Amino acid sequence: MEAKTSGPKQIQPSTPAPPPSTRRPRVREVSSRFMSPVTSSSSSAGDLHSLTCNSPKQHHLQHHQIQRSVSAQRLRRQLKMADGDENRSSETAARSLDSPFTLSQSRKSSKPSHLKPLNENSHRLETPTPMVPPPPSRSRLSQQRLPTATRLLQLSGISACYEKEGIINIQEKPKSNGSDQFPTLSCRTHLKVFNNPVPSSLNRSVSSPSSSCNVRESSSFSRLGLPLPPMAPKVPADTKKQRKVTEQLEDVHSLKLLHNRYLQWRFANANAQVKTQTHKTQTETMIHSFGSKISELHDSVQRKRIELQRLLKTKALLAITESQTPCLEQWSAIEEEYSTSVSQTIQAFSNASLRLPLDGDIMVDSKQLGDGLVAASKIVDGITQNVGNYMPKAKEMESLLSELTRVARSERSLTENCVVALLKTQASQVLNLSLHKLKNVL
């Protein structure tokens, strides 16, 4: 074992001692897993074996943890054997305890390089700090106090529990930041264990032994009269789930509000559509009634116009015949007189012819016969003169009667044309009303 530890000591270059620091040494922050005795390997391995689950992934993880715990115990033995060696720096010992790798790998990792920022506590990135070797006085002080603290914790019997917690923290611990030069178990590591999104089965498997370790730790500290170490605040592991649940509830509530608003708008649109439809039907019925009334008024107007034209024609005819009515009245009276006179003349001629003797000796007075013939000729001349006087009036009356018949014929033709025009107007009016209704419907 000494040969193994002397090999890395010869390879490590000597570093210049920095100026002494006035900072208080961080002895309380030394993790308990570095102070556990060598005999605690079986107990820690047994406890870790009890945390295994039925799944193959968790079994492989626990097997890897047991291998790391064995390597950490070997490094602790090397540290105890090389405790009196002053050439071995405290930083190398602390790094060898903190990591499960060899001392050469820890020495390679301690070289200055570009460090990746840590992501812990709600995935917040921290700026990396350069690694500064601790002062010699501080390393010596930590080497002196380390065995005493180890003895105290061996007496209390709580090193096994801290070793289990240390194994869990080794699995989840990121690369070294360089700000802490001692292998400490800070509160940030505990917070990262709670906040790290590891599977829930591993958290459940780790929770039961940690609670028993806390009970034994409190009882051991109460027996020794030492103050209890500060407990890390428990951060709920399901904050993200709660946040997601609240966001989902808010989304559901907003969707419900939007759905209610959509239903309100649909109801308003449907109500407005129904009102518009009723108003449209009422307007259509009113327009139809108005159209029927307008058609009736149009028919009455056409009838009135026809009657007016008829009255105008009658008035013109009356104006023409009104001047001829007195002549017609006189003609009736003259016709009666002339008819009576003609009848009397005929009777006188017949009487005179009957008085002539037809047999025996007839004696005729020529003078009386001549006087009778002269009187008869005078009567006939008067009759012919009167008839000649009434002949132009009769011709004029004949022309007027012919003109009256012609006007009556034209009136009859105009009446027939008016009937045809009325039929055409009615058909066009019906077509116009149907077109208006079709336009309103569209």
UniProtKB/Swiss-Prot annotation:
Give the region (Disordered) as residue ranges: 1-144, 221-240
Question: Secretion signal: which residues?
Answer: none
Locate the compositionally biased regions of type Basic and acidic residues.
80-89
User: Which domain of life does this protein belong to?
Assistant: Eukaryota
Motif QWRF motif per UniProt: ranges: 264-267
Composition bias (Basic residues) maps to: 57-66
Cross-referenced InterPro entries, in alphabetical order?
QWRF
Question: Per the UniProt record, which residue ranges are transmembrane?
Answer: none
The Swiss-Prot or TrEMBL record describes its family as follows: Belongs to the QWRF family.
**Which protein is depicted?**
QWRF motif-containing protein 6
Species of the source: Arabidopsis thaliana
